[in-house]
């Protein structure tokens, strides 16, 4: 199991939003590259980056900064936000991003999404962002009217390599994860699932860990909690390693 430290980029700085609202932001760092290095030094095995400007505008905005982050790290980076065509995807992968997270076009343009998965096999994942059981698109401001169960078979058939599942109601709220919804998805999925939204404490990590042993849950993204100190990344990763080591004995 992996805890993915998150960097959300807006106007060139690291921010966290509450429930994805652009008007409810907290700036945590004015130096995203230094922040990325910090999370690597704290034991991060992956870095989760979101270009919020890109998500809201529908096109890449922070590409030079994202390249600088990739260049500064030895760990892989997964990126989402504003990736809505093959040219953008190719540019980010060539810039050093290991895998890409697609949201809007996966739901609104299924043929284009399937083509992306075919062109970059194993490197394209989908972001399923749910509020009240319905999936959102366009930076969480548009309602698709679809549910996870309705889209999952098509996404898997298209060649999705991994899934990020966000409970928007819990994102940035530090209220714990939606375990029933997450377990349902992780059991139904044939590819790795990563939880996002609500991971606030080590107890939340401990609650998720059993699912990583019995389902396709790969890990969880943590943002506000690791910035505000309610979850210590190194402590969480050490705890996970101890559990995995004990099970291997």
From Swiss-Prot:
Short name of any one Pfam family annotated for the protein: His_biosynth
SUPFAM superfamilies (UniProt xref): Ribulose-phoshate binding barrel
One term under GO cellular component: cytoplasm
Domain of life: Bacteria
Known catalytic reactions: 1-(5-phospho-beta-D-ribosyl)-5-[(5-phospho-beta-D-ribosylamino)methylideneamino]imidazole-4-carboxamide = 5-[(5-phospho-1-deoxy-D-ribulos-1-ylimino)methylamino]-1-(5-phospho-beta-D-ribosyl)imidazole-4-carboxamide
Subcellular location: Cytoplasm
Gene3D superfamilies reported in the protein's UniProt record: Aldolase class I (3.20.20.70)
Pathway of action: Amino-acid biosynthesis; L-histidine biosynthesis; L-histidine from 5-phospho-alpha-D-ribose 1-diphosphate: step 4/9
Keywords recorded for this protein, A-Z: Amino-acid biosynthesis, Cytoplasm, Histidine biosynthesis, Isomerase
CDD domains noted in UniProt: HisA (cd04732)
EC id: 5.3.1.16
Keyword Cytoplasm: yes
Claim: Phosphoprotein is one of the keywords in the record: no
GO biological process, one term: L-tryptophan biosynthetic process
Gene Ontology terms for molecular function: 1-(5-phosphoribosyl)-5-[(5-phosphoribosylamino)methylideneamino]imidazole-4-carboxamide isomerase activity
The protein's enzyme class: isomerase
Annotated catalytic residues: 8, 129
InterPro entries: Aldolase_TIM, His_biosynth, HisA_bact_arch, Isoase_HisA-like, Isoase_HisA-like_bact, RibuloseP-bd_barrel
Similarity remark: Belongs to the HisA/HisF family.
PANTHER family: 1-(5-PHOSPHORIBOSYL)-5-[(5-PHOSPHORIBOSYLAMINO)METHYLIDENEAMINO] IMIDAZOLE-4-CARBOXAMIDE ISOMERASE
Name of the protein: 1-(5-phosphoribosyl)-5-[(5-phosphoribosylamino)methylideneamino] imidazole-4-carboxamide isomerase
């Amino acid at each position: 199991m992996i805890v993915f430290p998150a960097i959300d980029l807006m106007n060139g700085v690291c921010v966290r939003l509450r429930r994805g609202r652009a008007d409810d932001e907290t700036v945590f760092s004015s130096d995203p590259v230094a922040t990325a290095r910090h999370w690597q030094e704290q034991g991060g095995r992956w870095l989760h980056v979101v270009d919020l400007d890109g998500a809201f505008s529908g096109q890449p905005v922070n590409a030079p900064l994202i390249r600088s982050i990739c260049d500064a790290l030895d760990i892989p980076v997964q990126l989402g936000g504003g990736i809505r065509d093959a040219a953008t995807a190719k540019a980010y992968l060539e810039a050093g991003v290991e895998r890409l997270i697609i949201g809007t076009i996966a739901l609104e343009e299924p043929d284009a999404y399937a083509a992306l998965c075919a062109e970059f096999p194993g490197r394209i994942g989908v972001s399923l962002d749910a509020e009240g059981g319905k999936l959102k698109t366009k930076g969480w401001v548009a309602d698709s009217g679809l549910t996870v169960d309705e889209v999952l078979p098509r996404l898997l058939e298209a060649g999705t390599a991994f899934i990020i599942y966000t409970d928007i109601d819990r994102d940035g709220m530090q209220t714990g994860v939606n375990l029933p919804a997450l377990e349902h998805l992780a059991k139904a999925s044939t590819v790795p699932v990563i939880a996002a939204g609500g991971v606030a404490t080590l107890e939340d990590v401990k609650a998720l860990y059993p699912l990583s042993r019995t389902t396709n849950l790969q890990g969880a993204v943590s943002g506000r909690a690791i910035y505000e100190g309610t979850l210590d990344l190194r402590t969480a990763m050490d705890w996970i390693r101890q559990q995995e080591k004990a099970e291997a004995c």
